[in-house]
């Protein structure tokens, strides 16, 4: 009888007879530049970086479902992946880790206190050959670090459970409809802020038993609290620090939402970045404390490139007039547009990446570029509350306005194209 019981236990515990579930693995690596380098996001800077507020990170979360299908979320403290880096990383990740482009989601926190990357918004920065060389060197290192951290996450794959929930945090303000910014504190006090916002905080929690192994969180807001010369992940960096401190051994990853027209306001003080970061961390912690929805171990990944047509350039006379001032970013942009037209190399369309994942019954949409908030609100209205919309994903090439924003004009729908080129 004892032998029979032992045989039954062995059979029942055999891996081939246990229902397969999720596997997940997480890893992170410090990507803070080791030398002074030009910083990304603002064209008005006059000097390179001069220190570190807190480290910049590249983090990876690898997922594998019950059928062995894999996907990897890569979160970086950068302004945004450029077309050059995205193309290179797709090729290298496929070769090194057998991951197809649809299985790879590369997020950028859109921090404006990170380094300029290869091919990123060169027109707005006063770059010379030496500065570009340092940018190229750093970008090569970044690629290597991303390859390595992805490999480490895949190596760490182990049985887990995945859960999803949604919190709320209210510091994001529609920057188009609440000006001047100096009036924001009064508007907040009077509950008189205007314009669409998305204050949802989507959370994906990865558990090893009762222990939190990794957590991905999102929020639709520009990472522009800070504008000085020290590296940081802005408010989202402080959120990750707080979460990882509260959950030793866990890896926290930020997946930004459609915050192209949303700012953290008021801003420009480290104390505010820290405050917003802790507000967001508190929202994530509240979700973790509640009953979350378990996600079934089914994973599908899709990626489609859509040819978006460019609008018309300004008239030749306007370009020529602007090009006379090479010390201004619009002048540098105009000169480059003239050269592209003259050589017949002016593109008519841009290959825009749209990505769709199903993680259990969670629909996860990721969009390239800086996407305005209307998109996430509409997608969640159309597809339901279990819809997660990520922006600044894979290739950040321009602002992505809606028809409303285009009609209204302004920076997001018009003049920003000269910034992105």
Residue ranges and their predicted role:
Residues 280-281:
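Anionic-ligand-binding alpha/beta catalytic cores of soluble enzymes and soluble regulatory domains
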Residues 14-16:
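N-terminal signal peptide c-region/cleavage motif recognized by signal peptidases
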Residues 20-107, 111-251, 257-259, 268-275, ...:
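Conserved beta-alpha junction segments in alpha/beta enzyme cores
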Residues 264-266:
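A short acidic (Asp/Glu
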């Amino acid at each position: 009888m004892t032998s029979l019981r032992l045989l039954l236990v062995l059979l029942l515990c055999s891996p081939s007879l246990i229902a397969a579930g999720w596997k997940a693995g997480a890893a992170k690596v410090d990507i803070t530049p080791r030398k002074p380098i030009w910083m990304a996001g603002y064209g008005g800077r006059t000097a390179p970086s001069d220190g570190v507020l807190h480290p910049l990170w590249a983090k990876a979360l690898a997922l594998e479902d019950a059928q062995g299908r894999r996907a990897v979320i890569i979160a970086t403290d950068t302004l945004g992946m450029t077309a050059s880096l995205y193309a290179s990383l797709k090729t290298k990740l496929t070769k090194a880790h057998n991951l197809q482009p649809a299985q790879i989601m590369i997020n950028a926190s859109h921090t404006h206190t990170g380094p300029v990357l290869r091919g990123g918004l060169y027109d707005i920065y006063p770059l010379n050959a030496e500065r570009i060389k340092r940018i190229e060197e750093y970008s090569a290192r970044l690629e290597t670090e991303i390859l390595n951290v992805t490999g480490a996450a895949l190596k760490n794959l182990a049985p887990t459970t995945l859960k999803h929930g949604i919190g709320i945090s209210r510091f994001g303000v529609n920057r188009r409809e609440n000006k001047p910014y100096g009036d924001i504190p009064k508007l907040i006090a009077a509950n008189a802020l205007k314009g669409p916002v998305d204050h949802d905080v989507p959370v994906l929690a990865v558990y090893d038993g009762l222990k939190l192994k990794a957590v991905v969180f999102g929020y639709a807001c520009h990472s522009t609290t800070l504008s000085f010369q020290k590296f940081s992940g802005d408010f989202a960096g402080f959120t990750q620090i707080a979460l990882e401190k509260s959950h030793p051994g866990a890896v926290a990853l930020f997946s930004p939402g459609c915050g192209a027209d949303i700012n953290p306001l008021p801003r420009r003080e480290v104390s505010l970045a820290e405050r917003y970061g802790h507000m967001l961390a508190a929202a994530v912690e509240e979700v973790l404390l509640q009953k979350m929805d378990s996600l079934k171990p089914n994973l599908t990944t899709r990626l489609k490139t859509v040819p978006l047509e460019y609008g018309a350039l300004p008239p030749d006379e306007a370009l020529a007039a602007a090009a006379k001032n090479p010390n201004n970013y619009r002048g540098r942009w105009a000169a480059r547009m003239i050269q592209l037209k003259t050589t017949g190399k002016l593109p008519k369309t841009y290959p825009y990446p749209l990505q769709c994942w199903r993680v259990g019954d969670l629909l996860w949409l990721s969009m390239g570029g800086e996407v305005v908030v209307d998109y996430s609100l509409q997608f969640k209205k159309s597809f339901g509350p279990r819809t997660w919309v990520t922006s600044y994903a894979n290739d950040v090439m321009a602002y992505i306005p809606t028809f409303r924003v285009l009609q209204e004009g302004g920076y997001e729908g018009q003049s920003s194209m000269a910034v992105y080129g």
